[in-house]
Structure formats: C-alpha cells, structure tokens
C-alpha cells in the first residue's frame, strides 16, 4: 500500500493531460505541414531528464533526428544542429528558469520554433514560446504525446490513436 497516494487525483491529472492531446496534435500537425528538420527536447534538471526519455523513445522507433539538450550547456557551447527547421520542446512549472529563458531566446534567434508547456501562462517564457500550452503536471506524458504525434505523422506509429484511446 502506498502512503498518501491519492488515486482519484492521479487519474484526474492523467485525464487532464490526455485532454490537451487535441491541442498538441493541432500544433504538431501545423508544424509538420510547414516542414521541419529535427526535434530538440530542451530543459535543465528534471525537464532535461524528461526530454532524454522522449528522445530515447523516438530514437527507438523513428528516423526523425532528435536529441535532448541541457539549457545551460547550450548557452555555453551552442549546437550547430539548432536552426531553421528545428522544433524545440520545453516545459516549465515557473516559466522563469533563467537558463531555459536564455536558451529559448538564442534558439529562436537561430531560427528554431518552440513548443512550451508552461504552467504559468503570464511568465516571460510563456510569452516567448511560439506555441504555448498551460497544463500542470504529467510532463513525461505531454512530451510523449508530442513525440508520438510527430512519429504518427511521419508514418512510423500507425497505432498511435488506438493506443491513446485505451488510456
């Protein structure tokens, strides 16, 4: 038995995240229609770790070029793969993580488009990103929904809709 586990809250939070899948699909579909070159999962700390999970998930199943980028490292060294056609996905509870804000500005200056899951939609980061979705918690699920839609649109995940219908 798990102490202090609230099953009702857990189910509600997952269902809430699944409810934004239509918004995620709309954004990813728009990006796919415009064309893109690669996908970068940007973060620092826990968000970077979530990005690594999404990148590994995609590398296992997709030919789409993807990687996880540590915001602090990017601000120090840059990355020549980031530019026109790069799609950056990030997430932030506060919307004010200095390293992520700086990295997003630099990536956009290089030509990247940014999808941000920013919990507080009035913050600097929420205003910076090209596509903003505000929903707290379930960062990994949100990232996986983005990854899965890109793979589905690339003809690599035909069972995507059926899988999410089961959730």
PLM regions with names:
Residues 12-28, 67-80:
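Helix-loop module immediately N-terminal to the HCX5R catalytic loop
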Residues 1-26, 151-165:
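Cofactor-/ligand-binding subdomain signature composed of acidic, glycine-rich
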Residues 32-167:
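Glycine-rich phosphate-binding loops that contact phosphosugars or nucleotide phosphates
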